[in-house]
UniProtKB/Swiss-Prot annotation:
Belongs to the AdoMet synthase family. The lineage of its organism: Bacteria, Pseudomonadati, Pseudomonadota, Alphaproteobacteria, Hyphomicrobiales. It comes from Bradyrhizobium sp. (strain BTAi1 / ATCC BAA-1182). It catalyses: L-methionine + ATP + H2O = S-adenosyl-L-methionine + phosphate + diphosphate. Mg(2+) binds at residue 19. It comes from the Bacteria. Binds 2 divalent ions per subunit. This is S-adenosylmethionine synthase. It is an enzyme of class 2 (transferase). Residues 109-119 are annotated as: Flexible loop.
Amino acid sequence: MMRASYLFTSESVSEGHPDKVCDRISDEIVDLFYREGPKAGIDPWQIRAACETLATTNKVVIAGETRGPASVTNEHIEHVVREAIKDIGYEQAGFHWKTCDIEILLHPQSADIAQGVDALQPGEVKEEGAGDQGIMFGYACNETPDLMPAPIFYAHKILRLIAEARHSGVEKVLGPDSKSQVTVRYENGKPVGVREIVVSHQHLVEDMTSAQVRERVEPYVREALPKDWITKDTIWHINPTGKFFIGGPDGDTGLTGRKIIVDTYGGAAPHGGGAFSGKDPTKVDRSAAYAARYLAKNIVAAGLADRCTLQLAYAIGVARPLSIYIDTHGTGKVSEDKLEKAAAEVMNLTPRGIRSHLDLNRPIYARTAAYGHFGRTPDNEGGFSWEKTDLAEAFKRAV
């Protein structure tokens, strides 16, 4: 039975956090292959990319496996990497987009992996297997308009608003690196207020105090949160260490795939363990997690549950999901087994079916690298297609 009154906390990190710098670089490379492939006459279905990035003081290392056009050279990749770092905003002595050393260690995808992903299976036509085994979770709830848990939704929103002000030139003394954390108070199972707010934000003027940083960030925090959620009892922690001048990869080494809870539901739902960034959609760590969110969101959007957790499982080289599991946490209007059957009916959950339904063979991934992969708005270029609620009516009919 779900608790009625409790506190729940989630964190977010900005695009300038060292791990997020790496996620952005890895996803820029995936996008590069999808942009350049069609120009070289390569079918987007044949593109493969698995890119891992490490970033530290004045150094970026990229390693992984790819399959795509020969036109994507190391020089091309280096240019994309520098432009990404520039866009994030790093022009400091210890990490500058112009001068950091970039080492590229990409090589062709393993033939052993390729044969499992590309090969036809007996009795199936043009069906590709999953790129790896694993379990993936999707989640949705009716706590926010985007059907996301309130703590992670507002933690992202705080940093996104500050980042917009920084990029526009309004907040010139704030650096790219920042973190937020929001402790939400629930009553009768509904979010009603914030008890604790944490914002740690890099500043570009070395002697800025925590109080001065608070003067800068507090208006964005108040703008992000519902008006009556902040009270006299709300506790603020703004740059609680007192100083945050050295930021980004110069202050803390970053790696791709180390913010998987920030990327998803802020701890409000299970996680299968697989990261998203740097992976093309044959990797079900990414594409099946997107599909799981899509299905869970449409179940809630259809009014069939107030909360929904959905699990998918795959085996490498096998097209069909091994299992589909749904839990509506006591909020379902129909049984979970009916929803599980409906999920298999309304969407082809093979890797190829997911890529086709969500139109994932395109350069849409760099935009996902910060502020969450879920709870975002579908865009005209095909980004965040998994956030659509166009299956809601199909679910209603199927149950």
